C-alpha cells in the first residue's frame, strides 16, 4: 500500500514535472482520502500513505508555486464504488449516520473537483487538500 500510494505518486509526478516547468505551466492533482485525514481502524498503512500524499502535495506546491505549476490534492470520502457497495448494509448505514449529508459521494463529484483545480478557475489554488466527503470531516 505504501509503495503504490507514495512511490506511485512520486514516480508519476517525476515523469511530467520537467515538461510542465519547460512550458511554465502545469496542473498536478493527487488523490488522497478522508482516511488520510481522520485515520481508520485496521487501515494504518493506508491512512499513513494517503496522509503522505497530502504532505508530498503541499511540499511540491511550495517548490513549484512561482514556476507556473499548481499542485493540489482531492480527498474523497466514502464514494459509491464497488468497494463501498460491498460493505455490509449494517456497516454502510453506520457510515451514513456519520455523514451530515446522509449519502455517499459520487465519482462524478470527485471528477468535477479535479476538473475545477485544472481549469482556469483554479489558477490561484495551490497546496490545497480539497475534501469531498459530505461533511464527514471538517
Which residues are covered by each model-predicted region?
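C-terminal substrate-recognition "lid" of short-chain dehydrogenase/reductases
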Residues: 25, 103-132, 137
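Short, flexible catalytic-loop segment of classical short-chain dehydrogenase/reductase
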Residues: 37, 75-86
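Active-site loop immediately N-terminal to the catalytic Tyr-X3-Lys motif
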Residues: 38-44, 66-67, 102, 120
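Alpha-helical segment proximal to the catalytic Tyr-Lys
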Residues: 18, 62-66, 123
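Residue(s) in the substrate-gating loop at a strand-loop-helix junction
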Residues: 33
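Catalytic Tyr-X3-Lys loop
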Residues: 1-10, 25, 29, 46, ...
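Active-site helix of classical SDR
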Residues: 13, 49, 57
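Active-site loop-to-helix junction immediately N-terminal to the catalytic Tyr of the SDR YXXXK motif
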Residues: 39-47, 59, 87
